[in-house]
């Protein structure tokens, strides 16, 4: 098949395989014009030229009344999917932050202790109010602990999990304790036990 430069009207001999089904970018070797050439199934074949041209015409410029030459076939432009790359980078960044938080948690919150747990009714028969004492046995200030409560049935299966970030401004000074409460609605009727633990943000994400 042959193609024509839109700028200088110079014709070039190419093969269908060089252009491809989806087309590709080409560059005129005469005027250096760039354009996107699509495959035209209606173009004349090489055998339709009055002066038959052999396959060497693909490599060597040919001078005839068609003024045929050889174009510069540019490499296919790679398509980069930006959104998946950015999304993956965001997920990796969040995981790194959570892992850093986990390491801080291991060395910081292991001195907290939950004591004096009491349970009462909350609003209606399906609700529960949990009162507990949170003690800081360390020599430093601890802020914003995350408390996770699991509701368990008689077979020790977890029926639900509830988290309390203790009002986001909780401060527990060294060797001191505070009293907190957590309200839970719609407790399953098959609930038998509750489990109260101290967790970090990574634990909340994969709970």
Swiss-Prot record:
GO terms for cellular component: membrane. This is Uncharacterized protein RP193. It comes from the Bacteria. The keyword Nucleus does not apply. Keywords: Membrane, Transmembrane, Transmembrane helix. It holds the Pfam family Zn_ribbon_4. The keyword Membrane applies. It is found in: Membrane. It is a single-pass membrane protein. InterPro entries: Znf/thioredoxin_put (IPR011723). Its main location: membrane. The chain crosses the membrane at residues 82-102. It comes from Rickettsia prowazekii (strain Madrid E).
């Amino acid at each position: 098949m042959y193609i024509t430069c839109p700028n200088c009207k110079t014709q070039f001999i190419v093969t269908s395989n060089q252009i491809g089904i989806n087309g590709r970018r080409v560059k005129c070797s005469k005027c250096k014009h760039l354009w996107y050439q699509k495959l035209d199934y209606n173009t004349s074949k090489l055998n339709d030229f009055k002066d038959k041209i052999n396959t060497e015409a693909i490599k060597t410029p040919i001078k005839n009344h068609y003024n045929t030459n050889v174009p510069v076939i540019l490499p296919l432009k790679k398509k980069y999917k930006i959104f998946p790359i950015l999304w993956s980078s965001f997920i990796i960044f969040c995981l790194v932050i959570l892992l850093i938080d986990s390491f801080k948690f291991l060395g910081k919150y292991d001195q907290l202790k939950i004591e004096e747990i009491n349970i009462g009714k909350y609003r209606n028969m399906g609700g529960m109010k949990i009162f507990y004492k949170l003690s800081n046995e360390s020599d430093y200030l601890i802020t914003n602990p995350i408390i996770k409560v699991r509701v368990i049935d008689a077979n020790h299966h977890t029926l639900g999990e509830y988290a309390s970030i203790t009002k986001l401004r909780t401060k527990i000074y060294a060797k001191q304790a505070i009293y907190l409460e957590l309200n839970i609605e719609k407790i399953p009727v098959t609930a038998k036990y509750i489990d109260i633990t101290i967790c970090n943000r990574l634990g909340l994400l994969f709970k």
